[in-house]
C-alpha cells in the first residue's frame, strides 16, 4: 500500500479493498521500522491515529464518509495540534502543547483525514536543508548522505519514503517546493491568502503559506480542496470561492503559452538539472504547448530583498519567546533581563539567532529606511515582473532549485545556502502560486520542474502539472530505501 498515491488509496477505501485501520497500521509500521534512519518525524501519534481510523471506518460503514475519510497524513510540526506537541523543530518549544488546532488541521480532521504525527523541520522554518532542527537533521530517502531540502524536509522525506502518502508543509521562500524537488515528490505553494495561517506558527507573516506535499498533482488537488478557503481568524486569508481542483485536472494543453525566464537558466544552474528541465519542457511542447523566452529582470534582487524582509518579520514574531508565558525558560534567572537573555540564548539555534539579529538590525533606527523600506520597494518591482510576464504567457517554467540535493554538511556558508532558493524566493515575494513536480534525475538525486501561475490560478497550475504526469513517469519512481519492507 505504501507505493500508492493518495487518490489511489481513497479509491481503495471506497471500494472496500482495505480498511482505514489496516491502511494506517501499515503506515505506522513503516514509520516504526524505517524512520530511525530518516528522522522525518518529531512526534508519532499512533494511538490517536488508530482511534481516528476506526472512526473513519465506522463513518464509511454508515455512508457518512468525508473527502479524506481514513486517509493517513502527516503534519509539519509548525501547525498547532490540540493536545499534541508543536515544537517548530526548536528547543524553545520542545515542551509546548498547543491548546487548539490550526485551521488547516481542523479542516483535515473534519474531512476525515488521519494524522499519524508531526514531521521534522528546520527550526522555526528557517533553513533550506533540514539540518537546523533541534531534533537532528533529516536524511533524503534517495540518498541517505544527502539533505532532503528544507524547511519542510521531514514532510518531503516521509512522503518520498512511503511512510505517508501525503503531508502538509509551509513555504516562506521555497520550503515546500525545494524539498519536493530534492525528494522527487510534488509540492504546491498556494497563492498567499488562499490557505489560512491561523494556528501556523509565524516566521515571516507576509510570506508564509501552507500547502500540500504528495506524490502527484491530483493528490495535491484533493488536499488543497480541503485546506483552502477564507478564515475569519486570519485577516490575510482571502474570501474567494474554492474551486473543485480535482474536476479541473483534465485540461488540454493545446495552445498553452509557457514562458521560460532567461534569468532561471543562467550561471549557477547545474548542467544535469538544466538538461532534465529542458527535456520536461519538450514534453509540454509535444502536448501542444507553445514555449517562448521571457524576462524577470529583478530576479537577482530577490534574495537580498527576502533576507531583509523575512528576518525583520521574524525578529518581531519571535520576540514573544521570552520564557514568560510558554516555551523554554532558563533556570534560576537573577532578574527579568537575565531571564530574557538566557532563555533566548538557550532556546534558539544558531540560524534562528542569525536571522533575528539581521532582522533587528534592519528595523533599528537609522537603518529602517535604508534596508526595510528599500526591500519593500524591490518587492513591488519583483511582483510587477511577474504581472508583466503573465500578460504574455499563461505559466512560467524553470528549475525548482539550481542543483540536486547536496550532501549533509556540505553547505557551511550561510550565503551559499541562501542561494539554493534563488528560483523560489521571488514567488513568495510576489505572492503567486507555484508547484514543483518530479522531472528526472541528476545522478541518483531527483530534479524538480517548477511551474508558476498568476494569483489564484491554482486550478490551471494543477492541471498543467497533472497533464505532465499523465505523459511521464517520473512521479512513479521510488527510492530503493524501504523497498525490502512491503
Swiss-Prot record:
EC numbers, comma separated: 6.3.5.7
Protein keywords: ATP-binding, Ligase, Nucleotide-binding, Protein biosynthesis
Domain of life: Bacteria
GO molecular function: ATP binding; glutaminyl-tRNA synthase (glutamine-hydrolyzing) activity
Active site: 76 (charge relay system), 151 (charge relay system), 175 (acyl-ester intermediate)
SUPFAM superfamilies, per the entry: Amidase signature (AS) enzymes
A GO cellular component entry from the record: glutamyl-tRNA(Gln) amidotransferase complex
GO BP annotations, alphabetical order: translation
PROSITE patterns associated with the record: AMIDASES
One Pfam family linked to the record: Amidase
Stored InterPro entries: Amidase (IPR000120), Amidase_CS (IPR020556), Amidase_dom (IPR023631), AS_sf (IPR036928), GatA (IPR004412)
Catalyzed reactions: L-glutamyl-tRNA(Gln) + L-glutamine + ATP + H2O = L-glutaminyl-tRNA(Gln) + L-glutamate + ADP + phosphate + H(+)
HAMAP family reported for this sequence: GatA
NCBIfam families named in the record: gatA
Protein family according to the UniProt entry: Belongs to the amidase family. GatA subfamily.
Function: Allows the formation of correctly charged Gln-tRNA(Gln) through the transamidation of misacylated Glu-tRNA(Gln) in organisms which lack glutaminyl-tRNA synthetase. The reaction takes place in the presence of glutamine and ATP through an activated gamma-phospho-Glu-tRNA(Gln).
SUBUNIT field: Heterotrimer of A, B and C subunits.
Protein name (record): Glutamyl-tRNA(Gln) amidotransferase subunit A
Organism from which the protein derives: Chromohalobacter salexigens (strain ATCC BAA-138 / DSM 3043 / CIP 106854 / NCIMB 13768 / 1H11)
Gene giving rise to this polypeptide: gatA
